[in-house]
Structures are given as structure tokens and as C-alpha cells.
Amino acid sequence: MSLQAFRIGLLSTTAAPLAYARPFSSYAALLAKKKGKTSGKPGKADNEEPIEIIDVKKYVIDATKQFEKTLELHKRKLAEQKVGTASPTIFNDLRVGKEGQKFTELAATSLKGRNALIVTVFDPKDTKNIVSAIMAAGLNLNPERIPNNDQQLKVSLPPITTETRQAVCKDLKKVFEDYKHSALKESLGHVRGEIMKELKHLQKKNDDVKKVIQDVEKIHKEYTIKLQEQLKQAEKSVMNQ
């Protein structure tokens, strides 16, 4: 065999394996290429692990989407709380009778002016149980039968005073705290914590990961401010009623 043919054969048998990118499911770890023990021959590695390539910018996109969802839920909850007992949906979560039927399956509620709710019971035989469910709900509301009508109840609402406005504002603040930082999975703090937990599995010395952590923190602060603005607007609306 010629010297040139021998060299070509040697090169073809000692080429190092290529690194490859494996698909990344939700939040896999960002791994560096690790070298194992070598066989002693130059250019040969026996135990090299492949590189997993992750677009860490997805964390920022995901954080923004989840924070935006939290903002929408917070705004909706504030609106519900702001109405207080005057909301036609106030009884929707009640369970009625021994069988625990949903209130909305047995009756519908509408607002009459600013000081009363009208409950229309679909079947007269359920009226008594509807009354019991409302009185047992701890809402301090007393439904009364409308004369000559077995299917409608009138629920008088307490007058709006400075004290009631302040009480509503206190409830609004509680909603804000829940969506700012709590065990609630939609809270800004919980969302941030879950994302940071995933980021800890990535390379801490990686510059891209560091940048993502900084970006997520920045976005979290921005949405906390937006949440505070929603609270201020809701409180202002209540106190100016």
C-alpha cells in the first residue's frame, strides 16, 4: 500500500462524531458539550454528549403572554368585586337543595335599578330551596317573595355609604394582592417563580441565560406597575360613585 493511501485510510477511521441538536420539549436543560475519556488517539473522543440547543428567548415570550393573561383576569375580577352585591352573578356559585344543584340551573338573576336584584325561579317548587340557599350564603341578603308571583324573589341591596365604599376598596386591594403575589397559579409572582425555576436548570454562566433572567425580571416589574394602575382606577371608580 502506498503512503498516500495509508494516510487517507487513517483519516477516514479517526473522524470525531458530530454534535447534534435534540428536539426540546417544554423547558429542557441547556447543556454544554461534555468530553469523556479519550482513547489516547488525537482527535478521538469516546464519550462525548450531544449539545441540546434551546432558544432561551422563548422564556421571555412565554412570560409576557402569561403576565398579560394575569392582567386580563385581574381586571375582570376587579370589575366583579367593584359591583359587589349589586352584581347579577352574585348567586351563580351557590348550590341549592340537598342534591347541590347549581343555582344557574334553577334560577336567573337580574338587576333592578341600583338597589335590588330580581331572582326568577324556573320552577315554583324550587323557590323555597332558592331562598334557603341565598340566606345561607353569608351575604347578609334577605330574598322576599313578590306578591302574587311564586317564581320571583326581590332581594333588596344595602344602601351605598362611605363605609361600604371603603369595604369594597378593601376587597379590591385583596384581589390585587392575590394577583400580584400568591399561591394563585395566575398571580404574577407564581408565574415568575415557575419560569425562574426552569431557568435555574440552565447554564448560569451562559450570557444568553443571564440576559433572559434580566428581561423576565424587567417584564415582571412592568406588569406589577400595570396591575397597580388597574387597582387605582377601580378604587377611584368606587369612591366616586
From Swiss-Prot:
GO biological process annotation, one example: translation
InterPro entries noted in UniProt: Ribosome_recyc_fac, Ribosome_recyc_fac_dom, RRF_sf
Keywords for the protein's UniProt record, in alphabetical order: Mitochondrion, Protein biosynthesis, Transit peptide
Gene3D superfamilies in the cross-refs: 3.30.1360.40, Ribosome-recycling factor
Keyword Transit peptide: yes
Protein biosynthesis found in the keyword field: yes
Gene Ontology annotations for the cellular component aspect, listed alphabetically: mitochondrion
GO molecular function, one term: ribosomal large subunit binding
Localization (cell): Mitochondrion
Protein purpose: Necessary for protein synthesis in mitochondria. Functions as a ribosome recycling factor in mitochondria.
Recorded family membership: Belongs to the RRF family.
Protein name from the UniProt record: Ribosome-recycling factor, mitochondrial
Organism: Kluyveromyces lactis (strain ATCC 8585 / CBS 2359 / DSM 70799 / NBRC 1267 / NRRL Y-1140 / WM37) (Yeast)
Classification lineage: Eukaryota, Fungi, Dikarya, Ascomycota, Saccharomycotina
